[in-house]
From Swiss-Prot:
Stretches of the chain found on the membrane's Periplasmic side: 40-53, 106-113, 167-173, 263-282, 330-334, 395-401
Protein biosynthesis recorded as keyword: no
Organism encoding this protein: Escherichia coli (strain K12)
Upper taxonomic lineage: Bacteria, Pseudomonadati, Pseudomonadota, Gammaproteobacteria, Enterobacterales
Protein name per its UniProtKB record: Putative metabolite transport protein YaaU
Gene symbol of the encoding locus: yaaU
Family designation: Belongs to the major facilitator superfamily. Sugar transporter (TC 2.A.1.1) family.
Keyword check for Transmembrane helix: yes
SUPFAM superfamilies cross-referenced by the UniProt entry: MFS general substrate transporter
Length: 443
Protein backbone atom coordinates (compact mmCIF):
# COMPACT_ATOMS: atom_id res chain seq x y z
CA UNK A 1 0.00 0.00 0.00
CA UNK A 2 1.44 3.37 -1.06
CA UNK A 3 1.44 6.21 1.51
CA UNK A 4 -1.39 8.64 0.84
CA UNK A 5 -0.19 11.40 3.16
CA UNK A 6 3.07 12.91 4.35
CA UNK A 7 3.79 12.86 8.07
CA UNK A 8 3.98 16.66 8.10
CA UNK A 9 0.39 16.83 6.79
CA UNK A 10 -1.10 14.87 9.71
CA UNK A 11 -3.38 16.73 12.11
CA UNK A 12 -2.47 17.10 15.78
CA UNK A 13 -3.95 13.88 17.16
CA UNK A 14 -4.20 12.04 20.47
CA UNK A 15 -0.83 10.33 19.98
CA UNK A 16 0.82 13.73 19.42
CA UNK A 17 -0.82 15.06 22.60
CA UNK A 18 0.30 12.06 24.65
CA UNK A 19 3.89 12.23 23.43
CA UNK A 20 4.00 15.97 24.12
CA UNK A 21 2.47 15.66 27.60
CA UNK A 22 4.48 12.69 28.86
CA UNK A 23 7.64 13.67 27.01
CA UNK A 24 7.69 17.04 28.77
CA UNK A 25 7.66 15.20 32.10
CA UNK A 26 11.48 15.32 32.17
CA UNK A 27 11.73 19.15 32.15
CA UNK A 28 8.88 19.23 34.70
CA UNK A 29 10.90 16.96 37.00
CA UNK A 30 14.05 19.03 36.44
CA UNK A 31 12.29 22.18 37.62
CA UNK A 32 10.64 20.26 40.46
CA UNK A 33 13.80 18.58 41.78
CA UNK A 34 16.14 21.58 41.44
CA UNK A 35 13.75 23.97 43.17
CA UNK A 36 12.62 21.51 45.85
CA UNK A 37 16.12 21.22 47.33
CA UNK A 38 16.09 24.98 47.94
CA UNK A 39 12.79 24.75 49.82
CA UNK A 40 13.95 21.68 51.77
CA UNK A 41 17.21 23.36 52.90
CA UNK A 42 15.33 25.22 55.64
CA UNK A 43 14.84 21.89 57.43
CA UNK A 44 17.82 20.05 55.95
CA UNK A 45 20.44 22.47 57.26
CA UNK A 46 19.87 21.80 60.99
CA UNK A 47 18.84 18.15 60.48
CA UNK A 48 22.07 17.14 58.69
CA UNK A 49 24.21 19.94 60.16
CA UNK A 50 25.00 21.44 56.78
CA UNK A 51 27.41 24.37 56.55
CA UNK A 52 27.87 26.78 53.65
CA UNK A 53 30.41 24.49 51.97
CA UNK A 54 28.04 21.52 52.00
CA UNK A 55 25.16 23.63 50.68
CA UNK A 56 27.37 24.78 47.81
CA UNK A 57 28.48 21.21 47.11
CA UNK A 58 24.88 19.99 46.96
CA UNK A 59 24.03 22.57 44.31
CA UNK A 60 27.20 21.87 42.35
CA UNK A 61 26.66 18.10 42.64
CA UNK A 62 23.28 18.27 40.95
CA UNK A 63 24.65 20.43 38.14
CA UNK A 64 27.63 18.10 37.71
CA UNK A 65 25.22 15.18 37.43
CA UNK A 66 23.21 17.05 34.79
CA UNK A 67 26.44 17.69 32.88
CA UNK A 68 27.25 13.97 32.79
CA UNK A 69 23.68 12.83 32.10
CA UNK A 70 23.01 15.13 29.16
CA UNK A 71 26.29 14.44 27.38
CA UNK A 72 26.36 10.66 27.92
CA UNK A 73 22.75 9.59 27.48
CA UNK A 74 22.07 11.65 24.38
CA UNK A 75 24.66 9.48 22.65
CA UNK A 76 23.20 6.28 24.13
CA UNK A 77 19.69 7.27 23.00
CA UNK A 78 20.92 7.76 19.43
CA UNK A 79 22.30 4.22 19.56
CA UNK A 80 19.60 2.17 21.35
CA UNK A 81 16.46 4.20 20.65
CA UNK A 82 14.26 6.81 22.32
CA UNK A 83 11.54 4.67 23.89
CA UNK A 84 13.76 2.28 25.87
CA UNK A 85 15.75 5.10 27.48
CA UNK A 86 12.51 7.11 27.83
CA UNK A 87 11.30 4.48 30.33
CA UNK A 88 14.55 3.54 32.08
CA UNK A 89 15.50 7.05 33.11
CA UNK A 90 12.07 7.92 34.54
CA UNK A 91 12.16 4.74 36.67
CA UNK A 92 15.63 5.73 37.89
CA UNK A 93 14.45 9.22 38.88
CA UNK A 94 11.63 7.72 40.96
CA UNK A 95 13.89 5.16 42.67
CA UNK A 96 16.56 7.74 43.54
CA UNK A 97 13.90 10.15 44.86
CA UNK A 98 12.59 7.50 47.25
CA UNK A 99 16.14 6.53 48.30
CA UNK A 100 16.86 10.19 49.13
CA UNK A 101 14.21 10.05 51.85
CA UNK A 102 16.47 7.74 53.89
CA UNK A 103 19.79 9.62 53.79
CA UNK A 104 21.39 10.30 57.16
CA UNK A 105 24.52 12.29 56.30
CA UNK A 106 25.64 15.09 53.97
CA UNK A 107 27.78 12.63 51.99
CA UNK A 108 24.81 10.35 51.30
CA UNK A 109 22.69 13.33 50.25
CA UNK A 110 25.44 14.56 47.91
CA UNK A 111 25.65 11.14 46.24
CA UNK A 112 21.87 11.13 45.72
CA UNK A 113 21.93 14.65 44.26
CA UNK A 114 24.66 13.71 41.76
CA UNK A 115 22.75 10.57 40.75
CA UNK A 116 19.44 12.35 40.31
CA UNK A 117 21.21 15.05 38.29
CA UNK A 118 22.55 12.35 35.96
CA UNK A 119 19.18 10.69 35.31
CA UNK A 120 17.29 13.98 34.93
CA UNK A 121 19.99 15.20 32.55
CA UNK A 122 19.57 11.96 30.62
CA UNK A 123 15.89 12.66 29.97
CA UNK A 124 16.39 16.01 28.23
CA UNK A 125 18.02 14.87 24.97
CA UNK A 126 15.85 11.74 24.88
CA UNK A 127 12.53 13.53 25.42
CA UNK A 128 13.22 16.52 23.16
CA UNK A 129 14.34 14.25 20.32
CA UNK A 130 11.27 12.04 20.75
CA UNK A 131 8.90 15.01 20.69
CA UNK A 132 10.68 16.66 17.74
CA UNK A 133 10.67 13.49 15.66
CA UNK A 134 6.95 12.97 16.28
CA UNK A 135 6.02 16.60 15.50
CA UNK A 136 5.03 17.95 12.11
CA UNK A 137 6.63 21.11 10.75
CA UNK A 138 3.68 23.20 11.98
CA UNK A 139 3.61 21.61 15.45
CA UNK A 140 7.35 21.58 16.16
CA UNK A 141 7.80 25.10 17.53
CA UNK A 142 4.75 24.85 19.80
CA UNK A 143 5.80 21.43 21.09
CA UNK A 144 9.35 22.45 22.03
CA UNK A 145 8.08 25.71 23.57
CA UNK A 146 5.74 23.63 25.70
CA UNK A 147 8.77 21.73 27.03
CA UNK A 148 10.42 25.00 28.11
CA UNK A 149 7.27 26.12 29.92
CA UNK A 150 7.01 22.80 31.77
CA UNK A 151 10.25 23.50 33.64
CA UNK A 152 8.57 26.46 35.33
CA UNK A 153 5.42 24.43 35.98
CA UNK A 154 7.61 21.90 37.81
CA UNK A 155 9.34 24.66 39.76
CA UNK A 156 5.99 26.16 40.76
CA UNK A 157 4.66 22.78 41.90
CA UNK A 158 7.80 22.24 43.99
CA UNK A 159 7.29 25.54 45.80
CA UNK A 160 3.63 24.75 46.47
CA UNK A 161 4.41 21.25 47.79
CA UNK A 162 7.27 22.68 49.87
CA UNK A 163 4.91 25.29 51.33
CA UNK A 164 2.42 22.56 52.26
CA UNK A 165 5.10 20.37 53.93
CA UNK A 166 7.03 23.23 55.54
CA UNK A 167 5.60 22.75 59.04
CA UNK A 168 5.61 18.94 58.94
CA UNK A 169 8.25 17.37 61.20
CA UNK A 170 10.86 15.73 58.98
CA UNK A 171 9.08 17.29 56.04
CA UNK A 172 12.32 17.57 54.08
CA UNK A 173 12.32 13.80 53.56
CA UNK A 174 8.83 13.93 52.05
CA UNK A 175 9.77 16.97 49.96
CA UNK A 176 12.74 15.21 48.36
CA UNK A 177 10.88 11.93 47.96
CA UNK A 178 7.73 13.52 46.55
CA UNK A 179 9.20 13.53 43.01
CA UNK A 180 8.41 9.80 42.92
CA UNK A 181 4.69 10.60 42.58
CA UNK A 182 4.92 12.51 39.26
CA UNK A 183 7.51 9.91 38.16
CA UNK A 184 4.93 7.16 38.58
CA UNK A 185 2.31 9.11 36.63
CA UNK A 186 4.78 9.92 33.84
CA UNK A 187 5.94 6.28 33.68
CA UNK A 188 2.35 5.06 33.28
CA UNK A 189 1.78 7.65 30.54
CA UNK A 190 5.02 6.80 28.72
CA UNK A 191 4.59 3.04 28.86
CA UNK A 192 2.21 2.90 25.89
CA UNK A 193 4.15 5.37 23.73
CA UNK A 194 5.78 4.03 20.54
CA UNK A 195 9.35 4.34 19.31
CA UNK A 196 10.32 7.38 17.26
CA UNK A 197 9.42 6.69 13.59
CA UNK A 198 12.34 8.73 12.27
CA UNK A 199 14.79 6.81 14.46
CA UNK A 200 13.38 3.52 13.16
CA UNK A 201 13.81 4.68 9.57
CA UNK A 202 17.40 5.79 10.15
CA UNK A 203 18.17 2.36 11.64
CA UNK A 204 16.75 0.60 8.57
CA UNK A 205 13.70 -0.75 10.41
CA UNK A 206 11.37 0.43 7.65
CA UNK A 207 8.74 -2.32 7.93
CA UNK A 208 8.43 -1.79 11.69
CA UNK A 209 7.93 1.94 11.10
CA UNK A 210 5.29 1.33 8.40
CA UNK A 211 3.34 -1.05 10.65
CA UNK A 212 3.49 1.44 13.51
CA UNK A 213 2.16 4.27 11.31
CA UNK A 214 -0.78 2.12 10.15
CA UNK A 215 -1.55 1.19 13.75
CA UNK A 216 -1.42 4.82 14.94
CA UNK A 217 -3.01 6.63 11.98
CA UNK A 218 -4.86 3.90 10.08
CA UNK A 219 -2.83 4.33 6.89
CA UNK A 220 0.76 4.33 5.59
CA UNK A 221 2.54 7.65 6.06
CA UNK A 222 5.47 9.05 4.06
CA UNK A 223 8.40 10.99 5.55
CA UNK A 224 10.65 13.56 3.94
CA UNK A 225 13.94 11.74 3.54
CA UNK A 226 17.09 12.95 5.28
CA UNK A 227 20.45 12.62 3.58
CA UNK A 228 21.22 8.89 3.47
CA UNK A 229 24.80 9.06 4.77
CA UNK A 230 25.54 7.55 8.18
CA UNK A 231 26.25 10.23 10.78
CA UNK A 232 28.47 9.43 13.75
CA UNK A 233 28.98 11.12 17.12
CA UNK A 234 32.32 12.60 16.10
CA UNK A 235 30.58 14.35 13.20
CA UNK A 236 29.21 16.80 15.78
CA UNK A 237 32.68 18.33 15.73
CA UNK A 238 33.15 18.64 11.98
CA UNK A 239 32.99 21.86 9.97
CA UNK A 240 29.32 21.49 9.18
CA UNK A 241 27.86 20.69 12.61
CA UNK A 242 30.29 22.18 15.17
CA UNK A 243 29.47 25.83 14.31
CA UNK A 244 25.84 25.07 15.22
CA UNK A 245 27.00 23.41 18.47
CA UNK A 246 28.90 26.59 19.40
CA UNK A 247 26.07 28.88 18.27
CA UNK A 248 23.33 27.19 20.33
CA UNK A 249 25.62 26.76 23.35
CA UNK A 250 26.46 30.48 23.14
CA UNK A 251 22.86 31.74 23.03
CA UNK A 252 21.96 29.31 25.81
CA UNK A 253 24.80 30.61 28.01
CA UNK A 254 23.99 34.24 27.18
CA UNK A 255 20.42 33.63 28.35
CA UNK A 256 21.24 31.65 31.49
CA UNK A 257 23.96 33.78 33.13
CA UNK A 258 22.01 37.10 33.06
CA UNK A 259 18.93 35.20 34.27
CA UNK A 260 20.83 34.19 37.40
CA UNK A 261 21.83 37.83 37.86
CA UNK A 262 18.31 39.22 37.54
CA UNK A 263 17.05 36.60 39.97
CA UNK A 264 18.85 38.66 42.65
CA UNK A 265 15.94 41.09 42.44
CA UNK A 266 13.57 38.27 43.37
CA UNK A 267 13.67 38.95 47.14
CA UNK A 268 12.79 42.63 46.58
CA UNK A 269 9.78 41.71 44.47
CA UNK A 270 8.43 39.02 46.78
CA UNK A 271 9.17 41.27 49.76
CA UNK A 272 6.95 43.91 48.19
CA UNK A 273 4.18 41.32 48.17
CA UNK A 274 4.85 40.38 51.81
CA UNK A 275 6.09 36.91 50.84
CA UNK A 276 9.82 37.17 51.51
CA UNK A 277 10.37 35.42 54.83
CA UNK A 278 10.24 31.82 56.11
CA UNK A 279 7.40 29.65 54.90
CA UNK A 280 5.96 32.42 52.75
CA UNK A 281 9.21 32.58 50.74
CA UNK A 282 8.03 29.45 48.93
CA UNK A 283 4.95 31.34 47.74
CA UNK A 284 7.18 34.23 46.75
CA UNK A 285 9.18 31.88 44.56
CA UNK A 286 5.93 30.91 42.82
CA UNK A 287 5.55 34.55 41.75
CA UNK A 288 9.07 34.57 40.28
CA UNK A 289 8.49 31.30 38.41
CA UNK A 290 5.21 32.62 37.01
CA UNK A 291 7.00 35.65 35.53
CA UNK A 292 9.28 33.38 33.51
CA UNK A 293 6.60 30.82 32.68
CA UNK A 294 4.43 33.54 31.14
CA UNK A 295 7.40 34.54 29.00
CA UNK A 296 7.40 31.06 27.42
CA UNK A 297 3.82 31.33 26.16
CA UNK A 298 3.94 34.03 23.40
CA UNK A 299 6.83 32.34 21.53
CA UNK A 300 4.65 29.25 21.16
CA UNK A 301 2.68 31.30 18.62
CA UNK A 302 5.28 33.79 17.40
CA UNK A 303 7.87 31.20 16.35
CA UNK A 304 5.61 30.15 13.47
CA UNK A 305 4.48 33.67 12.57
CA UNK A 306 7.39 36.04 13.20
CA UNK A 307 9.97 33.30 12.68
CA UNK A 308 12.91 32.00 14.70
CA UNK A 309 15.57 34.55 13.77
CA UNK A 310 13.57 37.80 14.30
CA UNK A 311 12.20 36.51 17.61
CA UNK A 312 15.67 35.62 18.91
CA UNK A 313 17.18 38.96 17.89
CA UNK A 314 14.27 41.02 19.24
CA UNK A 315 14.22 39.11 22.52
CA UNK A 316 17.93 39.58 23.18
CA UNK A 317 17.59 43.30 22.37
CA UNK A 318 14.80 43.77 24.95
CA UNK A 319 16.59 41.65 27.56
CA UNK A 320 19.73 43.77 27.11
CA UNK A 321 17.67 46.95 27.51
CA UNK A 322 16.00 45.72 30.72
CA UNK A 323 19.34 44.76 32.30
CA UNK A 324 20.95 48.05 31.24
CA UNK A 325 18.13 50.05 32.85
CA UNK A 326 18.59 48.14 36.12
CA UNK A 327 22.33 48.79 36.01
CA UNK A 328 22.30 52.46 34.98
CA UNK A 329 19.53 53.59 37.36
CA UNK A 330 20.60 52.07 40.71
CA UNK A 331 18.08 53.95 42.87
CA UNK A 332 14.98 53.27 40.80
CA UNK A 333 11.76 52.63 42.71
CA UNK A 334 10.58 49.12 43.44
CA UNK A 335 7.80 49.28 40.86
CA UNK A 336 10.31 50.17 38.14
CA UNK A 337 12.39 47.21 39.32
CA UNK A 338 9.30 45.02 38.96
CA UNK A 339 8.65 46.44 35.48
CA UNK A 340 12.24 45.85 34.30
CA UNK A 341 12.18 42.36 35.82
CA UNK A 342 8.90 41.61 34.04
CA UNK A 343 10.26 42.87 30.69
CA UNK A 344 13.32 40.66 31.03
CA UNK A 345 11.30 37.61 32.11
CA UNK A 346 8.76 38.10 29.31
CA UNK A 347 11.34 38.37 26.53
CA UNK A 348 13.59 35.63 27.94
CA UNK A 349 11.00 33.17 26.64
CA UNK A 350 12.26 33.64 23.07
CA UNK A 351 15.84 32.44 23.64
CA UNK A 352 14.58 30.07 26.33
CA UNK A 353 12.40 28.25 23.80
CA UNK A 354 14.86 28.45 20.91
CA UNK A 355 17.71 26.96 22.90
CA UNK A 356 15.62 23.76 22.85
CA UNK A 357 14.17 24.13 19.36
CA UNK A 358 17.32 24.92 17.40
CA UNK A 359 19.42 21.84 18.36
CA UNK A 360 16.49 19.54 17.63
CA UNK A 361 16.02 21.11 14.19
CA UNK A 362 19.60 21.64 13.06
CA UNK A 363 21.04 18.14 13.52
CA UNK A 364 20.13 14.88 11.73
CA UNK A 365 18.29 12.06 13.49
CA UNK A 366 21.47 9.96 13.89
CA UNK A 367 23.04 12.53 16.23
CA UNK A 368 20.07 14.66 17.31
CA UNK A 369 19.97 13.49 20.94
CA UNK A 370 23.78 13.57 21.11
CA UNK A 371 23.75 17.18 19.90
CA UNK A 372 21.16 18.24 22.49
CA UNK A 373 23.20 16.49 25.19
CA UNK A 374 26.53 18.06 24.23
CA UNK A 375 25.04 21.55 23.85
CA UNK A 376 23.22 21.33 27.16
CA UNK A 377 26.43 20.13 28.85
CA UNK A 378 28.32 23.13 27.47
CA UNK A 379 25.58 25.46 28.73
CA UNK A 380 25.85 23.90 32.20
CA UNK A 381 29.44 25.13 32.37
CA UNK A 382 28.03 28.66 32.22
CA UNK A 383 25.44 27.76 34.86
CA UNK A 384 28.07 26.34 37.22
CA UNK A 385 30.38 29.34 36.74
CA UNK A 386 27.58 31.87 37.28
CA UNK A 387 26.31 30.04 40.39
CA UNK A 388 29.79 30.22 41.89
CA UNK A 389 30.95 33.62 40.62
CA UNK A 390 27.79 35.74 40.84
CA UNK A 391 27.71 36.19 44.66
CA UNK A 392 31.43 37.09 44.61
CA UNK A 393 30.93 39.60 41.79
CA UNK A 394 27.97 41.24 43.56
CA UNK A 395 29.93 41.46 46.82
CA UNK A 396 32.97 43.05 45.15
CA UNK A 397 31.37 45.27 42.51
CA UNK A 398 27.77 45.85 43.59
CA UNK A 399 24.41 45.06 42.06
CA UNK A 400 24.50 47.86 39.46
CA UNK A 401 27.74 46.65 37.90
CA UNK A 402 26.41 43.09 38.03
CA UNK A 403 23.39 44.15 35.99
CA UNK A 404 25.65 45.94 33.49
CA UNK A 405 27.75 42.78 33.22
CA UNK A 406 24.54 40.85 32.53
CA UNK A 407 23.58 43.44 29.89
CA UNK A 408 26.97 42.96 28.25
CA UNK A 409 26.53 39.19 28.12
CA UNK A 410 23.02 39.59 26.72
CA UNK A 411 24.38 42.05 24.13
CA UNK A 412 26.93 39.43 23.10
CA UNK A 413 24.03 36.99 22.62
CA UNK A 414 22.32 39.62 20.46
CA UNK A 415 25.40 40.07 18.26
CA UNK A 416 25.84 36.31 17.83
CA UNK A 417 22.16 36.02 16.89
CA UNK A 418 22.41 38.79 14.29
CA UNK A 419 25.48 37.14 12.78
CA UNK A 420 24.50 33.48 12.81
CA UNK A 421 20.86 32.75 13.77
CA UNK A 422 19.26 30.65 11.01
CA UNK A 423 15.63 30.82 9.92
CA UNK A 424 13.96 27.39 9.97
CA UNK A 425 10.29 28.41 9.99
CA UNK A 426 8.12 26.26 7.73
CA UNK A 427 10.91 23.80 6.93
CA UNK A 428 10.82 20.03 7.44
CA UNK A 429 13.38 18.28 9.65
CA UNK A 430 14.97 16.86 6.50
CA UNK A 431 15.55 20.45 5.32
CA UNK A 432 16.62 22.01 8.64
CA UNK A 433 19.09 19.22 9.42
CA UNK A 434 20.70 19.80 6.03
CA UNK A 435 21.62 23.45 6.64
CA UNK A 436 24.97 25.08 7.33
CA UNK A 437 25.69 27.99 9.69
CA UNK A 438 25.46 30.38 6.72
CA UNK A 439 21.94 29.21 5.90
CA UNK A 440 22.97 27.16 2.88
CA UNK A 441 21.72 23.63 2.32
CA UNK A 442 24.01 20.71 1.68
CA UNK A 443 23.42 18.38 -1.24
Amino acid sequence: MQPSRNFDDLKFSSIHRRILLWGSGGPFLDGYVLVMIGVALEQLTPALKLDADWIGLLGAGTLAGLFVGTSLFGYISDKVGRRKMFLIDIIAIGVISVATMFVSSPVELLVMRVLIGIVIGADYPIATSMITEFSSTRQRAFSISFIAAMWYVGATCADLVGYWLYDVEGGWRWMLGSAAIPCLLILIGRFELPESPRWLLRKGRVKECEEMMIKLFGEPVAFDEEQPQQTRFRDLFNRRHFPFVLFVAAIWTCQVIPMFAIYTFGPQIVGLLGLGVGKNAALGNVVISLFFMLGCIPPMLWLNTAGRRPLLIGSFAMMTLALAVLGLIPDMGIWLVVMAFAVYAFFSGGPGNLQWLYPNELFPTDIRASAVGVIMSLSRIGTIVSTWALPIFINNYGISNTMLMGAGISLFGLLISVAFAPETRGMSLAQTSNMTIRGQRMG
